[in-house]
């Protein structure tokens, strides 16, 4: 059996990793071994942070809703409870946008939530 040189494949593989590591500092963008580790770690961070981004946005929306709900005489939990009892189907993302950009509409939603809590 003939010996196989992997020159072309190895060069392509190295080139692919070094391309992904472009912009990294020092050896992380120059040396294949180090660059490969850096690219793998970057992938792990990216995977983790895509999930954390969703959590962070939800927390932000809740903070915004709570702030505006308190301006309308409700706490966040009472507001959400009232909205669900009033059969208003609106998610936190949209509700936080309304709280920021359309305070009168948010006040109307808050009033409906208050009425649903009383009944």
Swiss-Prot record:
Entry-linked CDD domains: Ribosomal_L20 (cd07026)
Highest taxon of source: Bacteria
Keywords: Ribonucleoprotein, Ribosomal protein, RNA-binding, rRNA-binding
GO MF term list: rRNA binding; structural constituent of ribosome
InterPro entries the UniProt entry points to: Ribosomal_bL20, Ribosomal_protein_bL20_C
GO biological process: ribosomal large subunit assembly; translation
Pfam families, alphabetized: Ribosomal_L20
Gene Ontology, cellular component aspect: ribonucleoprotein complex; ribosome
Function as written in the Swiss-Prot or TrEMBL entry: Binds directly to 23S ribosomal RNA and is necessary for the in vitro assembly process of the 50S ribosomal subunit. It is not involved in the protein synthesizing functions of that subunit.
Homology family: Belongs to the bacterial ribosomal protein bL20 family.
NCBIfam families per the UniProt record, alphabetical: rplT_bact
Name of the protein in its database record: Large ribosomal subunit protein bL20
Organism: Ruthia magnifica subsp. Calyptogena magnifica
Taxonomic lineage from the root: Bacteria, Pseudomonadati, Pseudomonadota, Gammaproteobacteria, Candidatus Pseudothioglobaceae
Name of the coding gene: rplT
